[in-house]
Amino acid sequence: MEDGSVSYGFKNIFITMFATFFFFKLLIKVFLALLTHFYIVKGNRKEAARIAEEIFGEISDCWADRSPLHEAAAQGRLLALKTLIAQGVNVNLVTINRVSSLHEACLGGHVACAKALLENGAHVNGVTVHGATPLFNACCSGSAACVNVLLEFGAKAQLEVHLASPIHEAVKRGNRECMEILLANNVNIDQEVPHLGTPLYAACTYQRLDCVKKLLELGANVNHGQWLDTPLHAAAKQNSVEIIHLLIDYGANLKCKNAQGQSALDLAAPKSSVEQALLLREGPPALSQLCRLCVRKCLGRNCHKTIHKLYLPDPLEKFLLYQ
């Protein structure tokens, strides 16, 4: 009986200690949250972000300091947005994560709101803590109109490697029109980013057939992917036979090996349609195909523009242009 009382006493002590620890931990988090709010009110967002990181372990998508301007831009309420601007609201207010109203407008594809913000001095190349620019958000939403407006106001189409890449985002989501606008503004068609590879590699990974076609047509390097992995390697892991044939037609090398020493055929699922397509194309290409690849290589990346200047018979010109 006495042993039971001792055991019960220890149990109560343990529960009390645990409850006290939990209470103090909760109290500290509440205090830090209040301190974060204080710094936001005072305008010291950098310190607020640091404290938020202490609370959450990483800077999370905390929207506690979203302004009415952010809400108006996100919802595409142009009249409300213009009213707030007329009242003197700063168009470059940002959240803890450095998300501006322009980021919100572009993510929602609200071109009228984006233009109003830009006309009133919004930073066109503002970067969030996650490396996203308004142009990246516009490509994410697939708004070609927003992309055009941003470029008109001086948005950088080609960004540093450590920032989120607009062209890769456009390709990932199959937003071909946004991709074409960026390429027309001198974005490197073979830009490689560490986690996505080149735009062509990304298009093959996400099976965006339209983007694959256009990138190849515009002269993307068919064998440049992600380090030693080629676009054909990426396509072989998926199930699009049409992309496999497209890549090989444009000169993809079936014998290329990745870092693990694997060819595209090694990566294809056994007895799949992709494996069959690769096996069928393993042999030597036709002489006409070799000639086409040779002519296009001699003319360079802009062959789609220069072939017309050769004044070739129409059927031959169409063959060289894969039409």
Curated annotation (Swiss-Prot):
Residues 273-323 form the SOCS box domain. It comes from the Eukaryota. GO terms for molecular function: ubiquitin-like ligase-substrate adaptor activity. One of its GO terms (biological process) is endoplasmic reticulum unfolded protein response. It holds the Pfam family SOCS_box. Pathway: Protein modification; protein ubiquitination. InterPro entries: Ankyrin-SOCS_box_domain (IPR051573), Ankyrin_rpt (IPR002110), Ankyrin_rpt-contain_sf (IPR036770), SOCS_box (IPR001496), SOCS_box-like_dom_sf (IPR036036). Keywords: ANK repeat, Endoplasmic reticulum, Repeat, Ubl conjugation pathway. ANK repeats lie at residues 64-93, 97-126, 130-159, 162-191, 195-224, 227-256. Disulfide bonds: none annotated. Its main location: endoplasmic reticulum. PANTHER family: ANKYRIN REPEAT AND SOCS BOX PROTEIN 11, SOWAH (DROSOPHILA) HOMOLOG. Substrate-recognition component of the ECS(ASB11) complex, composed of ASB11, CUL5, ELOB, ELOC and RNF7/RBX2. Belongs to the ankyrin SOCS box (ASB) family. This is Ankyrin repeat and SOCS box protein 11. It comes from Bos taurus (Bovine). The lineage of its organism: Eukaryota, Metazoa, Chordata, Craniata, Vertebrata.
